[in-house]
């Protein structure tokens, strides 16, 4: 029992003396993180297919509107990709960007500058129909996509 009391007395003496004996130490470090650029494009209102009527064929074109939600975290903006599907159209006119675009069979990429955030993108498309097109339902002749810069 005497040994236990001595051990407790020693521990108490060290515990109360420790702050007086302890030196002050400081440390600093830098933390950095790399956040990969990310873009998501969601169709809010876009037809799943293109319905071409006899009046559209006679007129030579048909029009649709589409609305998308674009969310990105890049400080410089994002890249909007417009990828036409061949065969149904001669050209596609795209309105709703900084300028009206007219595209043929080749894809177009458009830099969309702006701060990070979530934005609504409203586009209008005029599809100039190929002369061989007949009335009917077709897959949408344009794929809209977005990716980081």
Label each PLM-derived region with a short phrase:
Residues 1-2:
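N-terminal secretory signal peptides that target proteins for export/translocation
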Residues 6-17:
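Bacterial N-terminal signal peptides
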Residues 21-88, 106-149:
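N-terminal small/polar-rich segments of proteins
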Residues 89-101:
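Short, surface-exposed beta-strand/strand-loop-strand elements in extracellular ectodomains
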Residues 15, 69-72, 93-96:
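Short charge-dense sequence patches
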């Amino acid at each position: 029992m005497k040994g236990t009391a001595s051990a407790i007395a020693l521990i108490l003496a060290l515990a109360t003396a420790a702050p007086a004996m302890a030196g002050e130490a400081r440390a600093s470090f830098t933390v950095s993180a790399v956040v990969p650029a990310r873009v998501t494009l969601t169709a809010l209102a876009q037809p799943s297919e293109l319905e071409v009527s006899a009046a559209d064929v006679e007129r030579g074109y048909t029009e649709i509107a589409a609305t998308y939600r674009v969310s990105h975290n890049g400080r410089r903006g994002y890249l909007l990709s417009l990828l036409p599907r061949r065969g149904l159209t001669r050209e596609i006119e795209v309105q709703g960007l900084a300028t009206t675009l007219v595209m043929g069979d080749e894809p177009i990429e458009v830099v969309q500058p702006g701060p990070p955030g979530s934005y609504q993108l409203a586009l209008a498309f005029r599809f100039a129909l190929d002369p061989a097109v007949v009335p009917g339902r077709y897959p949408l002749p344009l794929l809209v996509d977005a990716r980081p810069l």
